[in-house]
Regions:
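Regulatory N- and C-terminal appendages and interdomain linkers associated
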Residues: 2-4, 17-127, 409-548
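Bacterial N-terminal signal peptides
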Residues: 8-16
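Active-site acidic catalytic loop and adjacent metal/ATP-binding pocket
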Residues: 81, 155, 299-351
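Conserved ATP-binding subdomain of kinase catalytic cores across diverse folds
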Residues: 119-254, 319
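ATP-dependent phospho-/nucleotidyl transfer catalytic cores
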Residues: 219-316
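C-terminal catalytic region of ATP-dependent kinase domains
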Residues: 318-319, 331-457, 464, 492
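Extracellular beta-rich repeat passengers
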Residues: 504-776
Length: 776
């Protein structure tokens, strides 16, 4: 009876669904803004129906701002999902079950269904439109419950987000070994590896409540949440698991197609990223487990070290499922060609078998895992991994696991035994590492001809400039052709078929495939000055003053400079470009914003600590005059004049700016995101767009700020919080603006103690939290 009632109820939602899609349009002068999170017109469900929509949060939110911002930052206990076409949804699940009794092919039934995703807290309600579909490769993703089926889901939100995720998976817990998946993703994150955030959540699906595993999808938002700039995300382009074996061709494909098509630089780099993976996979050891083995000899040493540590940790925790090639995922950093592993679908029973004596390479009765050979190169990584394990903050980890739903019994075990257990397991692994193993490397032909079937199923593709060489896997029959742009995208995405055969991109040519990859190829020039390694894409012409520790660099046009993983102490950097003519400026517009270095700044400071640093940049032709990424410390003074685009851009950083003077920026004078920033004195003049732009969940404190002759003095966006003591502006159209620009964030909070807007306009979306004392 309950389900029948919900069929009627959801019919009402289906009737109103499409009218809602167009009711939220908001007309503003801010073209980049989007609707407020959970627009009020979406909240159709009155409190009289609250019996069906229990509270999603145990926290008591006192304001609309805190509730909506909490959606982006706080783990929900319950998510309500309604499907307008509930009958068709359940019919689709029945078809999946019936199909499994014949030939299991779940992709036939992964259709998208419209849905409403609802979060509630006391009197506050948030309704978001989205789509859901079945997800999973095996029948364990469908569960029969009484007279109906439930399944694992993939949810895509048309607008809004949950915990900064617009796309996420909801797994039936048994498909990911329940609490084990929460623990595994959390411990990998704690040790500095990439892993999707995972936690238990109650799902009320059309009135039926069950516990699921919420897991963020590995996409652009995942990279952003891990303080990484977007680049290619790779996974194996293997046949479905029920068809894949050790004879299959299983090279990679790029899954984030949106990044590929943003510009030609990204598109061209896509081919290089797949070549990097080909170097890993093709030359695997013939004597090793062919379903798991990779070859690290042709990639950079830092990536190889990280990959070996990742493999060791998975072996210690018995995540053998995630080590099979078809389940592995990678991020390729286009700035240095490094390849970074991503934990996914471990399959471990660690928490269920924690009291059983551990033996390496044993997992239930699976003999395949006993075929793994770890060579002597793994020995040097064990002490490094042990050091990381010894530095685990167990109290912090325990609190995180509690929030994500782990039982107290397992949390107690982790706090009392985890470090000792992991160190003991690594000791046992060390004993089985082979000191005298001699690798027998696959050749290209060995890999592609593992099975005669590959000749009938596949083509392999090489790209030399604009021409593509299409070959049979035995490299005997080849022809040269041009591929359209759309076909090239399909090739990179693993969807291209030629004569009904799957086409795998390999590399530029065989010589390129056999050569070793190295980091910082674009920044081939290097100088060490005052103990600081400075890299550049051109010869570094500089002068120094030892008394003032001044480094004065005179670059040629489009010269870029990189300082990475450094300690900058009591140093001044002066970067002065020749002023571009108007013609040169117009001709080099795209080159300045997008180039093959993938660094946006003229001066790029990455992963570094700064103390008493001063910076001066003049006539910057780059997207950013200075770009700080994942850096910390304080800057005594920074002065920038004549930037073609942005002057200061800071991402994922924690920086104190003492004295900041920006003059004549072609776009924003200051742009900060995803970090914590403090400005003592901030003077911004003649900023073409914004004086300061603050976004992506940043926290900013400004003691004294003045803005003149700009379009917008202060823009605060996307879950950011800003506290300003004194703010003065002149000749500026908008004093401040508070709005959402990206769907994965929520409203922002602005507090100004003293401001003189001088009759300038203001703009704020209704759910912004604004406290301003205007003295004008």
């Amino acid at each position: 009876m309950k389900i029948s009632f919900f069929v009627l109820l959801t019919f009402f939602f289906f009737f109103s669904f499409f009218s809602l899609l167009s009711s939220n349009e908001q007309s503003t002068k801010f073209d980049s803004s989007i609707n407020q999170l959970c627009d009020d017109s979406d909240s159709l469900i009155e409190n009289s129906n609250s019996r069906y929509f229990d509270n999603s949060y145990s926290l008591n939110y006192e304001s609309l701002y805190s509730f909506r911002n909490g959606i982006t930052k706080t783990i929900p206990q319950r998510i309500n999902i309604l499907t307008p076409d509930a009958q068709q949804w359940y019919r689709n699940l029945e078809n999946i079950v019936n199909n499994s009794k014949q030939t299991w092919d779940p992709d036939r039934f992964k259709d998208n269904f419209d849905a409403k995703i609802i979060l509630k807290n006391n009197d506050f309600l948030c309704t978001m439109n989205g789509r859901i579909r079945f997800t999973g490769d095996y029948m364990d993703h469908v569960l029969k419950k009484e007279n109906m089926y439930i399944s694992s889901l993939e949810v895509s939100l048309n607008e809004g987000n949950i915990l900064q995720n617009r796309k996420f998976k909801l797994f039936i817990p048994r498909t990911r070994q329940g609490e084990n998946e929460i623990f595994m993703t959390s411990i990998f994150q704690e040790l500095g590896f990439l892993a999707p955030t995972t936690f238990f959540v109650e799902i009320d699906f059309n009135g039926d409540v069950n516990t699921y595993l919420f897991q963020e999808k590995i996409n652009a938002e995942f990279l952003q949440n891990n303080n990484l700039k977007e680049g290619p995300l790779l996974e194996s382009n293997a046949p479905p698991p029920y068809k894949w074996d050790d004879k299959s061709i299983d090279l990679a494909r790029i899954v984030n197609e949106t990044w590929l098509i943003q510009n030609d630089i990204n598109f061209q780099y896509g081919f290089k990223s797949l070549e990097i993976y080909s170097k890993l996979r093709i030359f695997h050891d013939q004597n090793n487990n062919s379903l798991m083995d990779l070859n690290y000899e042709r990639i950079d040493t830092i990536s190889a070290s990280n990959l070996r540590q990742f493999f060791l940790l998975n072996v210690a925790l018995q995540n053998y499922h995630s080590l099979t090639v078809d389940d592995r995922k990678y991020y390729i950093n286009p700035q240095n060609d490094s390849i970074v592993p991503i934990f996914y679908d471990g399959g471990s029973h660690f928490l269920n078998t924690k009291h059983i004596n551990y033996q390496p390479f044993t997992y239930a009765e699976n003999e395949d895992y006993g075929e793994i050979i770890l060579d002597i190169n793994y020995l040097k990584e064990i002490p490094i991994l042990k050091q990381k394990i010894n530095q685990i903050d167990l109290d912090k980890l325990a609190n995180l696991l509690k929030d994500r739903g782990l039982s107290q019994e397992n949390i107690d075990f982790i706090q009392n035994n985890l470090i000792e257990e992991l160190l003991s397991r690594l000791d046992k692994i060390e004993l089985v590492i082979s000191n005298n193993h001699i690798k027998k490397e696959n050749s290209v032909l060995d890999y592609f001809q593992k099975s005669e079937e590959n000749l009938n199923l596949n083509y392999i593709v090489f790209k030399d400039k604009e021409n593509f060489k299409i070959c049979s896997p035995d490299l005997i029959d080849c022809f040269t052709t041009n591929l359209s742009y759309d076909d090239q995208i399909k090739l990179l995405n693993g969807r291209l078929k030629i004569d009904d055969k799957i086409a795998f991109y390999v590399s530029k040519n065989l010589d390129s495939l056999y050569s070793k990859n190295s980091m910082n190829e674009m920044f081939e020039f290097k100088e060490n000055i005052y103990g600081i390694d400075i890299f550049s894409n051109q010869k570094i012409n500089y002068e120094i003053n030892d008394k003032s520790r001044l480094i004065k660099i005179k670059p040629k046009n489009q010269g870029k400079y990189l300082i990475s993983n450094s300690e900058l102490d009591n140093v001044t950097i002066d970067l002065s470009y020749d002023e571009l003519s108007k013609l040169d400026s117009e001709n080099n517009f795209d080159e300045a914003r997008y180039d093959k270095t993938f660094y946006t700044g003229c001066l790029n400071i990455y992963d570094s600590n700064m103390k008493n640093v001063s910076i001066k940049v003049t006539n910057s032709p780059c997207e950013d005059s200075v770009n700080f990424v994942r850096s910390k410390g304080y800057i005594n003074s920074i002065e920038i004049n004549g930037s073609k685009f942005d002057s200061i851009d800071a991402d994922f950083s924690e920086i104190l700016f003492m004295n900041t003077l920006i003059l004549n920026s072609g776009n924003d004078c200051v742009d900060v995101s995803k970090g914590e920033y403090k400005f003592e004195i901030l003077n911004l003049q003649n900023c073409f767009d914004k004086g300061i732009s603050i976004g992506e969940s940043s926290t900013v404190r400004i003691e004294e700020m003045s803005v003149s002759d700009s379009y917008i003095g202060l823009a605060i966006k996307d879950s950011s919080e800003v506290d300003i003591n004194f703010y003065k502006l002149t000749g500026t159209e908008y004093c401040y603006a508070s709005y959402r620009k990206k769907e994965e964030f929520g409203p922002s909070k602005l507090k100004i103690n003293q401001v003189n807007c001088n009759d300038s306009k203001t703009f704020s979306q209704p759910d912004s939290f604004i406290v301003v004392s205007d003295d004008s």
